[in-house]
């Protein structure tokens, strides 16, 4: 089972993402402030990190930068309300593997995470995130 560290200080986002990740078979560890997230990241083997930027005690950019300076190669996705182009560029240059902005779709987070994991040494099999079929049109339901 793949292990994901989710670092975000918004309880509703933590609940939503943890639910969807666990439903998809991931083991999720959560942290609600930057210092706790950093401590967990360096002391536990995670396959993936989802990281907010605006966190109490240590911001996400600092966490990402420090992890990369210390040669941690765990894939990192920044998930934040900061949608400024410069913030995105800085986050990616500091070592994030992806940068998504809030609001977000949990299905898209999962799809992006799986794509990154497939291309790293943390490989997972390619499985569709959504298997839902389109709703039948009125013409199809009358047949």
Model-identified regions with their sequence ranges:
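The feature encodes the CheY-like receiver
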Residues: 14, 56, 70, 84, ...
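Charged docking surfaces used in two-component/phosphorelay signaling
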Residues: 15-23
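Active-site beta3 strand of CheY-like receiver
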Residues: 44-50, 55
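Short hydrophobic/Thr-rich beta-strand motif most characteristic of the beta2 strand and flanking loop
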Residues: 25-33, 40
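Short, Lys/Arg-enriched segments at the junction into DNA-binding effector domains
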Residues: 3, 117-143
């Amino acid at each position: 089972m793949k292990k994901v560290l989710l670092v975000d200080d918004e309880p509703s986002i933590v609940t939503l993402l943890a639910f969807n990740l666990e439903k998809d078979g991931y083991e999720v560890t959560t942290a609600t402030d930057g210092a706790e997230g950093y401590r967990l990241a360096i002391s536990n083997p995670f396959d993936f990190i989802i990281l907010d930027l605006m966190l109490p005690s240590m911001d996400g950019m600092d966490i990402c930068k420090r992890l990369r300076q210390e040669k941690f190669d765990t894939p990192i996705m920044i998930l934040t309300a900061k949608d400024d182009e410069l913030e995105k560029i800085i986050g990616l240059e500091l070592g994030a593997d992806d940068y998504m902005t809030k609001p977000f779709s949990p299905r898209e987070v999962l799809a992006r995470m799986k794509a990154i994991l497939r291309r790293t040494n943390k490989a997972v099999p390619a499985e569709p995130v959504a298997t839902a079929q389109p709703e039948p049109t009125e013409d199809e339901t009358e047949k």
